[in-house]
């Protein structure tokens, strides 16, 4: 059974659908390199805006939980990554550039990257967590707020694009 079938079967049981969307969002943040928008298709097509808002909040909460786990992991692994990177010039160069990117773009860069519909969240979350200059470039709570708000923004962008596209087709 694939994810689409699981979502389709659970769609008319809102608490189950929302729970699946939450769990899926955690996995998308942690390991799945696929977009979360799959969970939004059915309520968008049906025009169930209240249901869509509930699913959007569940997705934002799930992605935030996943981001918190990755942030914690990043704080614990960053020293090892830095030590390892000192052995090879290319790795040292990459780590320095990644730290500079995170330091320069900060919360705004993270928010903008995570707001892009159909983009994988996994890589930006890991980059901003692992190359956080020992937790000095990004503070945990603001990192989590940026993740949550970007997830909400992403649902809003997708919803607006869907409504505009649907209206253009009916014109």
Name each model feature, range by range.
Residues 1-23, 47-171:
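Membrane-interfacial helix-loop-helix
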Residues 16-37:
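Hydrophobic transmembrane alpha-helices
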Residues 33-35, 43, 124:
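Proline-rich intrinsically disordered, low-complexity coils
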Residues 39-47:
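Short amphipathic helix-loop junctions that connect adjacent transmembrane helices
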């Amino acid at each position: 059974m694939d994810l689409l079938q699981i979502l389709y079967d659970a769609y008319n049981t809102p608490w189950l659908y929302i729970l699946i969307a939450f769990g899926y969002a955690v996995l998308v943040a942690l390991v799945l390199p696929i977009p979360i928008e799959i969970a939004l298709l059915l309520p968008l097509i049906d025009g169930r805006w209240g249901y869509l808002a509930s699913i959007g909040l569940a997705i934002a909460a799930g992605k935030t939980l996943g981001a918190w786990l990755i942030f914690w992991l990043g704080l614990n692994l960053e020293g090892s990554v830095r030590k390892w990177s000192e052995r090879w010039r290319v790795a040292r160069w990459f780590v320095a550039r990644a730290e500079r990117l995170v330091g320069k773009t900060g919360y705004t860069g993270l928010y903008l990257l995570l707001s892009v519909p159909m983009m994988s969240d996994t890589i930006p979350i890991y980059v901003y967590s692992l190359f956080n200059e020992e937790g000095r470039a990004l503070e945990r709570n603001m990192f989590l707020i940026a993740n949550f708000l970007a997830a909400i923004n992403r649902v809003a962008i997708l919803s607006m694009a869907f409504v505009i596209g649907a209206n253009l087709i009916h014109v």
